[in-house]
Every structure is written in C-alpha cells, then in structure tokens.
Amino acid sequence: MIAHWEQGRATVDALISARRIERIPPNRDLADEYLRQARAHLATSLLAAGTDPVGEFQLAYDAARKALASILINQGLRPTSSGGHIAVYEAVLAQLDPPLGDVFKPFGWMRPLRDDSEYPSPDRPVASGEDAGAGRAAAAPMIERAAKLLDLMPVYGR
C-alpha cells in the first residue's frame, strides 16, 4: 500500500472543508460489502435486460456509485447529504485521473441521466435500453478497478 496519496489532495480537502465529504473511520469490510452490492446490482441489471430500461440503468448506476464509494470508505471518507453522489465522483476523479479517468469518467454522464430517469420531465428523456447497456458496460470496469484499488490506496490523511 502507498503510504501517502498526494494526487487530488487539494480537491478532496476542499470537499471536506465545504462539508461535501466527511472523514469517518476507514472500513475495509464496508468497502468490500459495497463492492459485493455493486456486483449484485450489475448482475440484476443484466438479468432484467430488455424488460425495464429505467430500472436496468438505475441498477447499473448504483453499481458504479457503490464502486466509487467503496474507494472513499476504505480511505475513511464518505459524502455528506449536501455532497451526495457528485462529491463521490469529484473525490475519486481528483485522486485517480490521470491515469484512470477512462475508467471512472463515464459516471459523469450516468449521474444526470439517473436523475432525469428518477425525476422525469417532458424535456428530459429517461434511460433507454441502449443507455442501460452502456451503463452496465461502464460500471463493470469501475467495480473491478475499485476492487484492486482498495489494496493500494491509503487511509486519507492530512
């Protein structure tokens, strides 16, 4: 494991200062549970393929979100209610892009589509079957990369 992680420190510190992310005791068991849930969500989304595009997409989105959150939980960080899902994305991306932006950046397009699907309106379409497939394809590498990162990234410290 790396002793001290510098990349993205200014962004994560700013998220903490703004109370969008908070420090918690690091919890590897909970991080592993989040990854287990992420894999289950992804598998369930695939089982539903072709039957419920919005539900399929939301499961793929939740799989991706829990993969990203597992990284933070393992570091002793979590989003606050005011930070929400976007704070998770910002904290992970700040620390891991580069080199892993290609793996984690798809969460950026998934989040607003999830919101549009959860709170639909006539001018914002909900997720389609194609979106669900793309969401599954994006979530799978996020889960696998997060699983590998848990052994590499240290507890977040000052």
Residue ranges of model-derived segments:
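Terminal alpha-helical segments
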Residues: M1-R158
